[in-house]
From Swiss-Prot:
Gene (UniProt): SKIP11
Transmembrane parts of this sequence: none
Protein name: F-box/kelch-repeat protein SKIP11
Chief localisation class: nucleus
Compartment(s): Nucleus
Amino acid sequence: MLEDRSPDSCLSTRVFSSSRLSESNWSNSYMYPEDDDKLLGNGKRALEVVGEVRQTKSLKLMGFSIIYDSDSSDYSLSGGEEQADAAIGDGSSSRQEQEQQSDFNDNGGDSSDSHSLINEIGRDNSIDCLIRCSRSDYGSIASLNRNFRSLVKSGEIYRLRRQNGFVEHWVYFSCQLLEWVAFDPVERRWMQLPTMPSSVTFMCADKESLAVGTDLLVLGKDDFSSHVIYRYSLLTNSWSSGMKMNSPRCLFGSASLGEIAIFAGGCDSQGKILDFAEMYNSELQTWITLPRMNKPRKMCSGVFMDGKFYVIGGIGGADSKGLTCGEEYDLETKKWTQIPDLSPPRSRADQADMSPAAEAPPLVAVVNNQLYAADHADMEVRKYDKENKKWLTVGRLPERAGSVNGWGLAFRACGERLIVIGGPKCSGGGFIELNSWIPSDGGPPQWTLLDRKHSPTFVYNCAVMGC
C-alpha cells in the first residue's frame, strides 16, 4: 500500500517481518492522516507518484482506485478506468483547470456539497463503503482531501464501523521497555509504534495495559507513589499523558467494551487492597466511579461477557489468600453479584508450592460470550460451563507457550480467535510465537502458528484493540 512513499510524508507505522518476509525486510504501512499544513503546503508531497493508480485490496474489491495527480498534488477516488484517465490527464490542461480540480478534490469530488465524500454515490453510500475497508487503508483514504481526513482523524469512521458491526482486532504488545508493536492477525503484518515517553522510574516499573476504543492505555508508576497513565492514540499515532483515575491504583482487573472500560480492585500506593471500581470512556476521556464490589481484591482479571463485566479471582482478605470467587457487574442495574468458583482452579502443584502472589492473575479471555482460561502449569485450555457453573478442560495450549508462573504468557481474545503469545528462551536471545485458535466447532484446540518474532525477553504487556 503506497510502498514507495517516504515515512516523512505522513504519520506512519513500520510494517516488518511477516511469516512471508524476513525480519530485515521493511516496508511502510500508512494508516495515519497527515496534518493539514503538510498536505496543503507549497511543495509536493514526499512521494510524487506521477500518473500512477494505486489500489489497496479492500478498495479494489469495491471498485475504487486511489489516484494521484502530479500537477494538482492531490488524490481523488475513482470508480473506473475512464475517471482514472481523466483525473491523471495528459498534461495538456491549463493551470486554472488544475486548480479547479484541486478544489474539487478538497470538497470530496463535489463543488456544491463539501460533505459528500464520493459525489457519484453520496455521503451515506460513501461511508457505507468506507466502513468496510481495512483499518490499514485509512491512512491512504485520509490523504485524499480534507473531508476524508476529517472522517478518519476525528474517529468518526471508527464509531460508524462499531455501530454497523465492522470491527478489526489487532494485537498490541511489548517485549522491550517503552517499545510496542502491533500485529494484524488477518494480514499477518507487524507495525512498530512510536517509543513511549516516560521517566526512568516508569520505564523500570511494572506496567498494566488495556486497549479501549482507539486508545491504548499503559498504566504504571512515575515515582514510588505516583500512578500515571500514558495513552497511545490510533488516530494520531502518538503518545500523550492520560487522565488519571479518581482513585489511582495498580494490580487491578480490567476489560473494555467498545469505547468504555471498567477497572476493578487493585491496591493503592500504600499497598491497601481495594474494592473500588471505575469506568473509563475513551471518547470523552473521563472516569466515573462505580459502586464498590462485595470483596476487595488485587491481582485479579476482568472480562466482558453477555454485556456484563466480570472480575475474576485475585488476592484478598485479611490474610491475602487467593480468591476463587468472582463478581458480576450489571451496567443497567449498577449492582455487583458475587459468583462462587468463577476463577479457574489452580493446579495441585501450584497450590502446594507457590504463594498466590507469585503467580500471574488468571489468564482468561472471552470469545463469542464463552469464557476460556489458560492453565500455564498443566498447559491446558479450560472453558467455563455457564449452566453448571464449573470449569471443563477442552484441550492443550500450544507446545511453546512457555511462561514463568504465568508471567510472560499472553492469553487474549482477538475477535473470534483465541490468541496465545509466548515462547521459550534460547541461547540466541529468545523468540516468541503467536498462535491462534477459532473455537467454533466445539472440538479440542487446533492451534495455528501465525508468526514468530525474535525477542530478548518475554511478553511484558499485551492488549487487543478492536475498532
